[in-house]
């Protein structure tokens, strides 16, 4: 399913792909994904004198959840926010010209044909946000549908997830305003149980581009996954050719392998 999300990002026109995955799992998954994927627009371009010389690689980066956030607020929504923040910090440390102005989110739990997104690239990259919908359901309805967001939405989403409780109660404070009583264990770190709708809400659907995916499967549980496996759409799904997506690594620079 992670491979499907990576391919979707490539068709949507992402410049880089950031996968949020902890260190204990990322080596295994990375061995399957690799370090980059070819841009399908340039790969399948049959025009020009030498199309093979105009290939464009989309690098893939791996981001682990910070240890201070694990088992505290590391829900799926926080992974989205943490991945966007990590890409911003890395890009801004290199050059102001590399700072991303929009983020595209793709979930491994939502499957649909990503090829139509290739024709929507120019609209996806506009200032207006983009949302994938299934029967008028979006991420706001706890569907694992893809969407984009910018700087303003990032601040709002991060504020929503920070509404979760911590370890200390805010009701019992001393004279200096410092909490003196801890919350019960079952009430601590409530953000790790947040649903998508708890964070990604009040979306600007009316002023944004909405793509209604004709065959979308929301893999929220085992039964929905079984329905996908038994569907006709599953029979049409195939892995991209090796020229586009295959395990490859970047060569070392100035070092011996």
Short names for language-model regions:
Residues 94-102, 110-212:
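Conserved core of the sugar-phosphate nucleotidyltransferase
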Residues 15, 19-21, 184-190, 194-198, ...:
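Domain-wide signal for the mature, well-folded portions of proteins, strongly enriched
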Residues 43-64, 130-138, 212-215, 240-246:
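A generic structural motif
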Residues 25, 112, 224-225:
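Short phosphate-engaging motifs
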Residues 71-75, 140-145, 217-223:
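Short, solvent-exposed polar/charged micro-motifs at secondary-structure junctions
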Residues 1-100:
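Conserved N-terminal catalytic core of the sugar/cofactor nucleotidyltransferase
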Residues 203-257:
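C-terminal catalytic/acceptor-binding lobe
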